[in-house]
Amino acid sequence: MASLIDDDDGEFLIGRLLVAMPGIEDPRFERTVLYLCAHDEDAAMGLAVNRPVEGLTVFELLNRLGVRSEIQAPSDLVLLGGPLERERGFVLHTDDFSSPDSTLPVADGVALTATRDALDAMASAIKRPRKSLLALGYAGWGPGQLEQELRDNVWLICDADEGLLFDEDHEHKWTRALAKLGITADHLSATAGRA
């Protein structure tokens, strides 16, 4: 199991996955897998990567926003990135796309863009990132909040990989993240404690 901070280089959990424990008290995060885009001593920010918005595809959202798609109707589902600022869109994508002044490199091969440039790129036959997901809203923590949740065994920490992060099989991402840690939901208790 990983510690709060990577002992090798002193980095926080940027670019890692948080996997909700069974029995999480907030139903908005039940069976959720979050990708941490930012994390330092003052705050943390992440996107849920397995919570589709019911019946809303990227193509439909692009149409609503007046973004003309050059590619065959993308059937990717829009994700609910978290409970904060749900009217704001975030595109998590491979780093083969970058928008000057608005793309934030997150971790090896992954970047985040929260401007119209990313939507235009998703709709483009030429500029489209190799892999991407569109999320509305985000999850956020203030100073020490995430660290306390980790001490309280609310989340497991898992290394992210492109296959798990961008896979469209959202329903099974939680169990796949657990499997990557070498466990199943049956191994976990809905109650937390410390030995």
Swiss-Prot record:
InterPro entries attached to this UniProt entry: AlgH-like (IPR003774)
Coiled-coil portions: none
Pfam families, per database record: DUF179 (PF02622)
GO cellular component terms, A-Z: cytosol
Stated family: Belongs to the UPF0301 (AlgH) family.
Entry-linked HAMAP family: UPF0301
Name of the featured protein: UPF0301 protein CCNA_03506
